[in-house]
């Protein structure tokens, strides 16, 4: 149970700014107004998207009943666990500027849009 208390996978989540060319700048762990190097973070869509980096890990889903289940995560390839490769997840709800979606703080989220449109607009940034 000690590993559960320490949250080893979740403790490796890192906030960052991800640009369209793939450049990553990590936020200060306790102050997302600044990067790790101490420079100030701007709130501009031209500077990229605010994301959370999810590390390489392993997971399994344990089902206890129809509506009762849990996801177990590990840094190690335990038997029955599936590899989850590093990914980036938006830190904020999607904000649309024109036909492109962004993850930028202090913006009103885009609503009343279907899933297909959201996916198309989210992909535009990295094309």
Regions found by a protein language model. Name each.
Residues 1-60, 108-127:
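Conserved hydrophobic ligand-interaction patch in extracellular adhesion modules
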Residues 37, 67-68:
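Long, low-complexity, polar/charged, intrinsically disordered or flexibly structured peripheral segments
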Residues 41-48, 70-127:
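Short aromatic-cysteine micro-motif
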Residues 60-65, 96-100:
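Short, solvent-exposed loop/turn elements at domain surfaces
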């Amino acid at each position: 149970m000690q590993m559960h208390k320490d949250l080893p996978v979740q403790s490796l989540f890192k906030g960052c700014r991800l640009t369209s060319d793939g450049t990553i700048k990590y936020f200060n762990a306790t102050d997302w107004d600044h990067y790790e190097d101490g420079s100030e973070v701007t709130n501009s869509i031209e500077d990229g998207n605010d994301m959370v980096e999810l590390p390489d890990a392993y997971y399994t889903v344990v089902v206890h009943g129809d509506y009762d289940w849990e996801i177990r995560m590990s840094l190690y390839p335990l038997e029955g666990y599936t590899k989850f490769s590093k990914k980036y997840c938006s830190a904020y709800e999607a904000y649309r500027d024109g036909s492109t979606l962004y993850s930028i703080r202090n913006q009103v989220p885009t609503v009343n849009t279907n899933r297909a449109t959201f996916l198309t607009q989210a992909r535009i940034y990295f094309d």
